[in-house]
From Swiss-Prot:
<keyword id="KW-0408">Iron</keyword>
<dbReference type="Pfam" id="PF01507">
    <property type="entry name" value="PAPS_reduct"/>
</dbReference>
<keyword id="KW-0411">Iron-sulfur</keyword>
<dbReference type="InterPro" id="IPR014729">
    <property type="entry name" value="Rossmann-like_a/b/a_fold"/>
</dbReference>
<feature type="binding site">
    <location>
        <position position="121"/>
    </location>
    <ligand>
        <name>[4Fe-4S] cluster</name>
    </ligand>
</feature>
<dbReference type="GO" id="GO:0004604">
    <property type="term" value="F:phosphoadenylyl-sulfate reductase (thioredoxin) activity"/>
</dbReference>
<protein>
    <recommendedName>
        <fullName>Adenosine 5'-phosphosulfate reductase</fullName>
        <ecNumber>1.8.4.10</ecNumber>
    </recommendedName>
</protein>
<dbReference type="GO" id="GO:0046872">
    <property type="term" value="F:metal ion binding"/>
</dbReference>
<keyword id="KW-0560">Oxidoreductase</keyword>
<dbReference type="GO" id="GO:0019344">
    <property type="term" value="P:cysteine biosynthetic process"/>
</dbReference>
<comment type="function">
    <text>Catalyzes the formation of sulfite from adenosine 5'-phosphosulfate (APS) using thioredoxin as an electron donor.</text>
</comment>
<dbReference type="InterPro" id="IPR004511">
    <property type="entry name" value="PAPS/APS_Rdtase"/>
</dbReference>
<comment type="similarity">
    <text>Belongs to the PAPS reductase family. CysH subfamily.</text>
</comment>
<dbReference type="InterPro" id="IPR002500">
    <property type="entry name" value="PAPS_reduct_dom"/>
</dbReference>
<feature type="binding site">
    <location>
        <position position="207"/>
    </location>
    <ligand>
        <name>[4Fe-4S] cluster</name>
    </ligand>
</feature>
<dbReference type="GO" id="GO:0043866">
    <property type="term" value="F:adenylyl-sulfate reductase (thioredoxin) activity"/>
</dbReference>
<keyword id="KW-0479">Metal-binding</keyword>
Length: 235
């Protein structure tokens, strides 16, 4: 089995990228054969997440999907999760919450920490909870695409994740924004209505705005903060 500690000694898999799903289904089939229940999908329920959930359901209908429930998400995001649960009732969707409630965080670090120190807020409400989830598994799945931002252009299908000492599987690396939406429309998948309101990338409500640059899908995240990632993905 390919693990973080055996990264240098185990042969890495290769996948075709010229088929209908640009390798995504092949990658997922390999991942669930390789890891079984030792792999989870950390999903934000953005549009890439919806595509991945549909693909995963074809490979492992009872897969474990983890949502980092920071307590700061848009209501539209929670509505999307409810629709996904109705569409894929066999999936095991886990709402992973941080140790601190928003009130406890405010008491300890001050009100609206996301405005003063967004990195600390992301660490408390996303990074630490994900680390706890990944402690019990060998690998995780992510919806990263190379087209999403300059910081993601070199992502591979299978990656050594030094931050979480895990294997990170990214089936959608070759998908374009157009590919994603074509798949959603073709299969009539439920999705977050905020995408129709100018939000190509959706995170916590206080730190997400409509895209500022049409050529940078993540330009609406942490606008004015000099920040482009929540800390889950090394750049």
């Amino acid at each position: 089995m390919l693990t973080y500690d055996r990264w240098e000694t185990v042969e890495k898999p290769s996948f075709p990228s010229d088929n209908e799903t640009k390798g995504a289904l092949d990658v997922l089939a390999w991942a669930y054969r390789e890891y079984g229940d030792e792999i989870v999908y950390a999903c934000s329920f953005g549009i890439e997440g919806i595509v991945l959930i549909d693909l995963i359901s074809q490979v492992k209908p009872d897969a474990e999907i983890v949502f980092l429930d920071t307590g700061l998400h848009f209501q539209e995001t929670y509505d999307t999760i409810a629709k996904v649960k109705e569409t894929y009732p066999s999936l095991r969707i886990i709402m992973k919450q941080p140790h601190l409630t928003l009130e406890e965080q405010a008491a300890q670090f001050g009100d609206e920490l996301w405005k003063r120190d967004p990195n600390k807020c992301c660490e408390l409400r996303k990074v630490i909870p994900l680390r706890e989830v990944l402690t019990g598994v060998t690998a995780w799945i992510s919806g990263l695409r190379r087209e999403q931002s300059p910081t993601r252009r070199h992502v591979e299908y299978v990656n050594k994740d030094d931050k979480f000492r895990s294997i990170k599987v990214c089936p959608l690396i070759h998908w374009t924004w157009k590919d994603v939406w074509n798949y959603v429309y073709k299969h009539s998948l439920p999705y977050n209505v905020l995408h129709d309101r100018g939000y190509p990338s959706i995170g916590c409500a206080p730190c997400t705005a409509p895209a500022l640059d049409p050529n940078d899908l993540r330009s609406g995240r942490w606008a004015g903060q000099g920040k482009t990632e929540c800390g889950l993905h090394l750049t």
